[in-house]
Curated annotation (Swiss-Prot):
This is UPF0102 protein Bcep1808_0248. GO terms for molecular function: nucleic acid binding. It comes from Burkholderia vietnamiensis (strain G4 / LMG 22486) (Burkholderia cepacia (strain R1808)). Belongs to the UPF0102 family. SUPFAM superfamilies: Restriction endonuclease-like.
């Protein structure tokens, strides 16, 4: 089964839907794509292989799907915030977001990776800094 180490609850709600740190839907998508590309390059430099990006499945979206050198599937949520206000980038992955990511990941895993272990990571960009949180949450967290 897909698993990861337990993590403390991130507290707070998902990021606001309207306005937010990066206003404008088109601009938000472009900004998001830029951060996802930077996260992908960062992870590839650390030995993970790219599998897929922006996979929409079962009502959720997987920002990045990577594969570790040991064959483990790594589902990566990419978040960006200009500052740590309201808890910052990592804390913005609230239980609702985790639930959507987990549902999509488990469906992807069943179709493409059953038999392989998997984990859920977060790459958080905040005030120009990148943090890679391995095993950020578990499939049974949400």
């Amino acid at each position: 089964m897909c698993h990861a180490a337990p993590a403390a609850p991130a507290g707070g709600r998902d990021a606001p839907r309207g306005g937010g740190e990066f206003s404008g839907a088109v601009r938000s998508r472009a900004v998001g794509a830029n951060f996802e590309q930077r996260a992908r390059q960062f992870l590839e430099r650390r030995g993970l292989a790219f599998v897929a990006a922006n996979v929409t499945i079962r009502g959720g979206e997987l920002d990045l799907v990577m594969r570790a050198s040991d064959g483990m599937l790594v589902f990566v949520e990419v978040r960006a915030r200009r500052s740590a206000r309201h808890g910052g980038a990592a804390a913005s992955v609230g239980w609702r977001k985790r639930r959507r990511v987990i549902a999509a990941a488990l469906d992807f895993w069943a179709r493409h990776g059953a038999g392989a272990a998997c984990r859920f990571d977060v790459v958080a960009f905040e005030a120009g800094r990148l943090d890679w949180l391995r095993d950020a949450f578990r499939a049974d967290d949400a």
